[in-house]
Amino acid sequence: MVKPERRTKADLIAAAAIVVVVAVGAALIWWNSDARATVSRPADRPVPALHAAKTVPTTLRELWTAASGKTTQPAVVGGVVVTGDGDEMLGRDPATGSTLWSYSRGRELCGVTTVYQFAVAVYPDGRGCGQASAIDASTGRRGPARSSLADAEVKLSTDGTTILSYGDSRLEQWRSDLVRMISYGYLDAVVKPGVPASPLCRLTSAAASPASVAVMEACPKQNDLRLTLLKAAKEEDQPDVKRVALPGVGVDSDAQVIAVSETKAAIYVPTPQPCVNIIDETGNTIASTLLPHPPTPVTATTRVGDVVTWYTGDSVLVFDANGLRYKYTVSAQGGQAPIGPATMLAGHLLVPVTSGYDTFDAQSGAGQTHIALARPPVNTAVIPALAGSVLLEQRGSQLVALGQ
């Protein structure tokens, strides 16, 4: 008969040591993990939906202000105004600015944007600004998340149903569930044969629609920029690509992608003379709008209702959102010069101007009324948006709420 195995004192000590090592290792992993640094405080109750303003206000006054250096324009989704500053993204009451929910990861934010019903915070890790977390804006509860290879700095934009994130060497387009639709540019390792593993070109400007992406690239040993049109394909890292030469448009020029529709892209080029060209999906220029002079370094674009508006630094060009057909230009008049792109309020185009807002017929561009508002001087574009009946302005790193 085999004698039962006896555990010695040494065995017990060894087993205890293993348990301690495993526990310490787990504790160290947790201590250095994003989970330990994440602080999520959902809303006490679901946030009610906003109701659109039905009339244009006759007066405006400041309601509240908040730091929001990580948004590039007012972010409104799920009944809240979303701000991002430092390491924290907040969902705020549009009327009062009070915090309804908060989310932070213990690291400086790369940027904040919105998509569908989510507020999206992007944080850095060892692979760049590619840690994205979606928060249901109406509840403050966590939704989808993703981790991606990215540049150390990225620019974020949204069309409402997708997000574009791009830096100097790489871009990605994400669906509302943060699943990647398109990736393009630098890879840190060869994943598939035929997919480049090194940066080919520097990405200088990009914009997207749910159906396509347009990006300008400065490529090695090339004096001119090129425009690249991307469409999602079966493999996200092998999109359909159409490259368009931009002769005479230097790699250090201020050329930029203004907006993208399903099959067209609006781009600004400075040569042979300043103009906005509309490029179709085959790469052909199908329309051009000449500008009286080049835009300033301070430009901005908004997509509101069925129009796209582009602020050039002293005027606002308005295009049809679907086909990017040029409609009209809002220029300085009566001592009032535009200081940012437009938004839409109660069916009227609302343009921030020197001492307030001017309203215009959205279809014809005919001037209507002026709403007085005193602002401190700003050296950036003033970018407006609506949150119900509250008018928001992104003024550099500050978000300002206005009402009657």
Give the location of each predicted region.
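Acidic, serine/threonine- and glycine-rich low-complexity intrinsically disordered segments
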Residues: 185-321
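Aromatic (tryptophan-biased) beta-strands that constitute blades/sheets of beta-rich domains
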Residues: 7-14, 28-79, 87-88, 93-109, ...
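Repeated scaffold domains used in trafficking and secretory/extracellular systems
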Residues: 65-76, 104-118, 147-161, 190-206, ...
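Long, acidic/polar, low-complexity amphipathic helices and coiled-coil-like
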Residues: 91, 95-225
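Intrinsically disordered, low-complexity segments enriched in Gly and acidic/Ser/Thr residues
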Residues: 282, 290-294, 303-372
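Structural recognition of the beta-propeller blade-terminating site
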Residues: 93, 134-136, 174-175, 228-234, ...
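Terminal targeting segments of Actinobacterial cell-envelope proteins
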Residues: 1-11, 19-23
